[in-house]
């Protein structure tokens, strides 16, 4: 493998770490509209709060709940993302990664909707795990 990180892998690592630092400095409430919330009511673009908004299908994948959460996701992104990007090229790699993030988000929305409609608690989903597990799957194949 090359000694330098491929550009998209490097950009994803930097973006995730930078956003985690911002989360730590500004507090979690600032980023609530960007976490993935289950659908609990009607879409309201003027009151994002704790309800699903379409942009959350991408933004949740760049937020993390703790330093350990961030470190393990970024380690896996480095380990599996760099070789895949070198094999596929940056465009295909980024498209695949983002499709995995959105796909995992859609699955989580379905589970969250079921949980909330069954009387379960409303909670946000954050983290790059959906994208990372997609990379792990591709790497393993």
Located regions from the model:
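N-terminal TM1-TM2 helical hairpin plus the immediately adjacent luminal interfacial "cap"
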Residues: 5-126
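Cytosolic juxtamembrane amphipathic/interface segments immediately preceding
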Residues: 1-2
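Membrane-interface micro-motifs in multi-pass membrane enzymes
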Residues: 121-141
């Amino acid at each position: 493998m090359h000694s330098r990180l491929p550009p998209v892998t490097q950009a994803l690592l930097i973006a995730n770490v930078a956003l985690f630092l911002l989360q730590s400095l500004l507090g979690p409430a600032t980023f609530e509209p960007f976490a993935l919330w289950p659908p609990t009511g009607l879409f309201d673009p003027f009151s994002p709060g704790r309800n699903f908004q379409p942009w959350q299908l991408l933004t949740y994948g760049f937020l993390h709940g703790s330093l350990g959460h961030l470190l393990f996701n970024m380690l896996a992104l480095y380990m599996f993302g760099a070789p895949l990007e070198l094999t596929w090229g940056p465009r295909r790699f980024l498209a695949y990664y983002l499709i995995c993030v959105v796909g995992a988000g859609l699955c989580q929305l379905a589970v969250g909707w079921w949980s909330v409609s069954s009387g379960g608690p409303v909670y946000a989903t954050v983290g790059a795990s959906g994208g990372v597990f997609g990379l792990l799957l591709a790497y393993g194949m």
